[in-house]
């Protein structure tokens, strides 16, 4: 303990100045001075150390410090535990445990994707899930949470998420709504379909964050789950969508299965829930396949037989066409051969026909050998006579006369071709019968007679042409009567042409160069038929007669040499 004697130097209301013996000045509060002290008074001050009170204070302090340490230093916030709740083709649902903040307070909870901030979780103390939508199909990415508190920041574990493929149906989570009692399915059928698909079952009764589809058959806005699904933008569809996915073995679009917009007849037509019929059909097909297996080759063989039949049917048609072509050519040859045989066997009949010709136009002796060509050429020559007769009234109808001439020319060419075939056959016969010299001599004599008759007929034709030309110019009755007399002679060119054809055919039998001569004579005959209107054309017709004589003479000489 220390005792000090001090002298009060000055006394104030708050402070007093005390002086020591060593003349040190000490300020001392006046409130601690005893009562009645004034300036010049001497006082004594004693100072002691209180060890007991010091211990008590120390114990109190340590106790308070321990409490602070245990309250704020030992209970720290825990980092969040992040988990995957559900994954689909385009979405992911994340889940984490309840946050343990300790004695700290929460500032923020942030979600990161591949190191990039996606956003803050709303109401982090209440929400423990988060859904990410609009993700790419079959892609991988990393997700992490960061917890910000007054005690510091804490990072969660990093999770790698891979979205599903279109064929992976394990992410489908269904919530079941209202079903009508008349439906073809029930809750057990839906759960069985989910099981076959590989989706999550049993079905949910309440809409949650991981609910992907809400199944019902009718709209019921009184149902809170229906309203919640509508608010959460969850597709509200019919249960047939599950069967469609089960059939396709892949996720199917929900557009055709919306409860609001679906077309029920189209859905019912597909018979998604007919299990008995499908099973019975499968069993029936499995039983019938081994029985019908031997019949398969027979069915496959049928088309082959049909093809063969068709090919067989096609072949006779080609053969028939060939036969028809050959048959059309053969009758002409058969008729000509019949005519030849008739001429050889019955010369009397031929003589009668030649007599008829002599009675109508000019007197021509009958020749049995040359009548072969006269009969064959009778039809085209008759056509030429029609041309001659038709050209007489050409002043009235010129257009009418032109049409049949084109048809007649075609018939003449066809008859000429048949005559050439017959003449070729006859030439071969004549070559084979070279020993028959007397017959050739008789033929030469007949040719001379025919040439003389041809000259007479040509003169008559020129006369008739002149008569027709002079009728419209002169009005005399004598000329009209002459024209009338010429009318019956209009038939004479028909027969005279026949004679020329006889002569030509006979000449064709004799030599090999007859084909060229026939062409020239046919052209001359056509020119003569068309020259009825003008005298100049008639003169050309007479000019064509003179070269025919020269040709006939040459042919005679050749025949005599042979």
UniProtKB/Swiss-Prot annotation:
Domain (Fibronectin type-III) ranges: 78-170
GO BP annotation list: ascospore wall assembly; cellular bud site selection; chitin catabolic process; conjugation with cellular fusion; Golgi to plasma membrane transport; regulation of DNA-templated transcription
Origin: domain of life: Eukaryota
Low complexity bias: start-end ranges: 488-508
Signal peptide limits: none
Biased composition (Basic and acidic residues): 297-326, 410-419
Ranges of compositional bias, category Basic residues: 548-562
Record-linked CDD domains: BRCT_CHS5_like, Chs5_N
Record gene name: CHS5
Family, per entry: Belongs to the CHS5 family.
Origin species: Candida albicans (strain SC5314 / ATCC MYA-2876)
PROSITE patterns named in the record: BRCT, FN3
Ranges annotated as biased composition (Acidic residues): 514-526
Ranges of Polar residues composition bias in the record: 534-547
Pfam families: BRCT, CHS5_N, fn3_2
Residues covered by the BRCT domain: 164-259
One GO MF term attached to the UniProt entry: protein dimerization activity
Compartment list: Golgi apparatus
SMART domains linked to this entry: BRCT (SM00292)
Protein name: Chitin biosynthesis protein CHS5
InterPro entries: BRCT_dom (IPR001357), BRCT_dom_sf (IPR036420), Chs5_N (IPR031673), CHS_Export/Cell_Fusion_Reg (IPR052827), Fn3_2 (IPR031669), FN3_dom (IPR003961), Ig-like_fold (IPR013783)
Protein keywords: Golgi apparatus
Job of this protein: Involved in chitin synthesis and also required for mating.
Region (Disordered) location: 283-329, 370-562
GO cellular component, one term: exomer complex
């Amino acid at each position: 303990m220390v005792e000090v004697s001090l002298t009060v130097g000055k006394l104030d209301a708050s402070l007093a100045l005390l002086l020591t013996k060593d003349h040190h000045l000490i300020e001392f509060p006046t409130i601690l001075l005893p009562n009645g002290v004034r300036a010049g008074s001497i006082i004594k001050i004693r100072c002691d150390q209180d060890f007991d009170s010091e211990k008590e204070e120390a114990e109190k302090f340590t106790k308070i410090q321990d409490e602070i340490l245990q309250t704020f230093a030992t209970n720290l916030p825990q980092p969040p535990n992040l988990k995957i709740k559900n994954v689909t083709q385009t979405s992911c649902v994340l889940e984490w445990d309840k946050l343990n903040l300790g004695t700290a307070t929460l500032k923020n909870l942030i979600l990161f994707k591949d190191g990039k901030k996606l956003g803050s979780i709303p109401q982090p103390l209440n929400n423990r899930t988060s859904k990410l939508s609009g993700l790419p199909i079959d892609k991988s990415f990393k997700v992490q949470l960061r917890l910000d508190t007054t005690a510091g920041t804490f990072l969660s574990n990093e999770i790698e998420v891979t979205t599903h493929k279109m064929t992976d149906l394990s992410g489908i989570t269904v919530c079941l709504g209202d079903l009508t009692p008349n439906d073809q399915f029930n809750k057990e059928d839906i759960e069985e379909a989910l099981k076959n698909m590989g989706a999550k079952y049993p079905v949910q009764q309440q809409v949650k964050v991981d609910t992907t589809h809400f199944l019902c058959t009718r709209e019921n806005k009184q149902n809170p789950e229906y309203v919640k699904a509508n608010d959460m933008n969850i597709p509200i569809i019919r249960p047939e969508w599950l069967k469609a996915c089960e059939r396709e073995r892949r996720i199917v679009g929900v557009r055709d299965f919306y409860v609001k917009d679906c077309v029920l007849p189209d859905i019912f037509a597909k018979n998604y829930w007919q299990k008995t019929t499908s099973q019975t059909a499968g069993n029936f097909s499995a039983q019938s396949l081994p029985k019908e297996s031997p019949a398969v080759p027979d069915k496959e063989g049928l088309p082959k037989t049909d093809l063969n039949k068709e090919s067989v049917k096609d072949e006779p048609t080609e053969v028939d066409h060939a036969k028809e072509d050959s048959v059309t050519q053969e009758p002409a040859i058969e008729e000509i051969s019949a005519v030849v045989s008739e001429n050889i066997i019955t010369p009397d009949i031929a003589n009668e026909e030649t007599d008829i010709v002599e009675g109508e136009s000019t007197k021509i002796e009958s020749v049995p050998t040359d009548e072969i060509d006269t009969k064959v050429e009778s039809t085209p020559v008759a056509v030429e006579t029609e041309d001659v007769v038709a050209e007489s009234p050409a002043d009235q109808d010129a257009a009418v006369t032109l049409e049949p001439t084109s048809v007649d020319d075609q018939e003449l060419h066809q008859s000429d071709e048949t005559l050439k075939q017959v003449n070729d056959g006859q030439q071969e016969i004549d070559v084979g019968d070279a020993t028959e010299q007397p017959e050739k001599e008789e033929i030469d004599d007949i040719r001379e007679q025919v040439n003389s008759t041809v000259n007479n007929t040509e003169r008559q034709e020129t006369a008739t042409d002149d008569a027709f030309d002079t009728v419209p110019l002169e009005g005399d009755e004598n000329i009209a009567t002459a024209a009338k007399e010429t009318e019956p002679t209009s038939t004479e060119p028909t027969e005279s042409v026949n004679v020329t054809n006889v002569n030509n055919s006979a000449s064709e039998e004799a030599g090999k160069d007859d084909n060229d001569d026939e062409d020239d004579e046919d052209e001359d005959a056509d020119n003569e038929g068309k020259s009825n209107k003008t005298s100049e054309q008639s003169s050309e017709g007479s000019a064509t007669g003179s070269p025919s004589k020269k040709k006939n003479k040459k042919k005679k000489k050749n025949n005599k040499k042979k």
